[in-house]
A protein has these predicted regions:
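Helix-coil boundary/capping segments in enzymes
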Residues: 1-181
Length: 181
């Protein structure tokens, strides 16, 4: 049963998803040496022993499901639409090449599910800030070709934030594309 659209529509605006390739990559990140505070979250979501963190172990299947259980759950809870974005930490913990590839793949999958359910889902595109030039190209593709609604960046990228001038081309592209970040 679809949400009652005669009443005010309930739109969930911070709905995370992932794809198997990102999950596998983050599992690898979780198992690599490092001291980033982000590793705590990554380990709990992507590499937690089920016995140690049963709630976190149950989280990943929900992130990977974009239709089978998500749509009935939306109906059950009266949610007419979800604004989907790649879950934290996005592609920020990968090298530039891997991040670019995974962001492109995630955006393609997101656009596919939106095309199947355009009244139920909208989406924010991921991009790889590690390579601002390639990020701008993916941002343009996401808005112009995939018809996504804006962009998601999950926190910092290699301990750099968007006030660093190297990221200004990304901010300029978002403005030119009239896309929110």
């Amino acid at each position: 049963m679809a949400a009652d659209l005669k009443s005010p529509r309930r739109i969930a605006t911070e709905e995370a998803f992932s794809i198997p390739e990102v999950a596998a990559g983050l599992r690898g990140v979780a198992r690599a040496p490092g001291n980033s505070l982000d590793l705590i979250l990554v380990k709990r979501i992507y590499d937690a022993p089920k016995d140690d963190h049963p709630q976190m172990a149950a989280l990943l299947p929900g992130l990977l499901d974009l239709e089978e259980k998500r749509l009935p759950d939306m109906d059950k809870n009266g949610v007419a639409m979800q604004l989907l974005s790649l879950t934290a930490p996005g592609v920020q913990m990968f090298d530039a090449d891997t991040a670019t590839e995974l962001a492109t793949l995630a955006n393609d999958r997101l656009a596919e599910v939106i095309s199947r359910h355009p009244t139920r889902f909208a989406g924010l595109a991921a991009f790889a800030p590690q390579s601002p030039k390639r990020a701008v190209k993916e941002m343009e593709r996401a808005i112009k070709t995939l018809k996504l609604n804006g962009f998601i960046v999950n926190s910092h990228t290699n301990n750099d934030y968007f006030d660093n001038p190297k990221f200004f081309p990304i901010l300029e592209a978002a403005e030119a594309l009239d896309g929110c970040i």
